């Protein structure tokens, strides 16, 4: 009868043969190698069943189908062919952090929140840079560069002592008069600042101070402002980066933008 047998060229094959009492033989070739190397051909093979006219014919069309199926299995699936994979980022490269953009200034650099925009507003002496949230200008960052006779930031004293010399960064009380405000304010005061945390570090041989301050006003605007200040001295200049966000937005996601901007600040 006409039968179809499959062979794998240039590779070893494993075979098994079994014989039944009725003298019907069959041969099977099994391989775990690449299916696109599979070759099929039709063969003439005699069998006792041919005399009874009950022969089973495997057509060449079936053999061709086997080849097509093997080629399909052996082919590689590209990322473009698997749209669902792109959405899940299964095949793609690890996504880069797009929340921040690198900013290189004159003698300093830092990471700026990608959705914040540059602003021409100048608040403080020596201010050379300002970025703010397009939807809430309370969330912003500034960089100031001013001359100094200090050789290191530690020459200003402790972080707390340094803050008293640059307290203008926290904003000045605009109202002076007799008033008693709720919320723990002293008599006659409508604004307060609490130093929450201080730290110091050395980067590239330069000493840095980082201060976390919570300022509040009697009008309760935003529940207060979280302000992070990073400062250092280099080449006879005092470099300060201050980033801030309102208390409400601070806990709604703005915290990471403020902290990253302040802690990424460094001088060349």
Swiss-Prot record:
InterPro entries in the record: Mog1/PsbP_a/b/a-sand, PsbP_C
Location of the transit peptide in the chain: 1-82
Claim: Amino-acid biosynthesis is one of the keywords in the record: no
Localization: Plastid, Chloroplast thylakoid membrane
GO cellular component, one term: photosystem II oxygen evolving complex
PANTHER family per record: OXYGEN-EVOLVING ENHANCER PROTEIN 2-1, CHLOROPLASTIC, PTHR31407
Main location: plastid
Role: May be involved in the regulation of photosystem II.
An MF annotation (GO) of this entry: calcium ion binding
Name of protein: Oxygen-evolving enhancer protein 2-1, chloroplastic
Superkingdom classification of source: Eukaryota
Protein family per UniProt: Belongs to the PsbP family.
Swiss-Prot/TrEMBL GO biological process terms: photosynthesis
Gene3D superfamilies linked: Mog1/PsbP, alpha/beta/alpha sandwich
Pfam families per record: PsbP
This protein's encoding gene: PSBP1
Keywords: Chloroplast, Membrane, Photosynthesis, Photosystem II, Plastid, Thylakoid, Transit peptide
């Amino acid at each position: 009868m006409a039968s179809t047998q499959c062979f794998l060229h240039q590779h070893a094959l494993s075979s098994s043969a079994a014989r039944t009492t009725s003298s019907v033989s069959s041969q099977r070739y099994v391989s775990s190698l690449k299916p696109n190397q599979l070759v099929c051909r039709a063969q003439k093979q005699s069998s006792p069943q041919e005399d009874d006219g009950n022969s089973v014919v495997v057509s060449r069309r079936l053999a061709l189908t086997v080849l097509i199926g093997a080629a399909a299995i052996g082919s590689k699936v590209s990322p473009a062919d698997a749209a669902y994979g792109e959405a899940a980022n299964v095949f793609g490269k690890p996504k880069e952090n797009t929340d921040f953009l690198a900013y290189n200034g004159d003698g300093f650099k830092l990471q700026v929140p990608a959705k914040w925009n540059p602003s021409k507003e100048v608040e403080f002496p020596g201010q050379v840079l300002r970025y703010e949230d397009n939807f809430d200008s309370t969330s912003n960052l500034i960089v100031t560069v001013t001359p100094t006779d200090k050789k290191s930031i530690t020459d200003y004293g402790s972080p707390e002592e340094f803050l008293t010399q640059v307290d203008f960064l926290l904003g000045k009380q605009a109202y002076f008069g007799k008033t008693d405000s709720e919320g723990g304010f002293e008599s006659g005061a409508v604004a307060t600042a609490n130093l929450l945390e201080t730290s110091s570090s050395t980067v590239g041989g330069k000493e840095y101070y980082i201060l976390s301050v919570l300022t509040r006003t009697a009008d309760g605007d935003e529940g207060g402002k979280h302000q992070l200040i990073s400062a250092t001295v280099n080449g006879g200049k005092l470099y300060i980066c201050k980033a801030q966000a309102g208390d409400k937005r601070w806990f709604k996601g703005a915290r990471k933008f403020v902290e990253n901007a302040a802690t990424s600040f460094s001088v060349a």
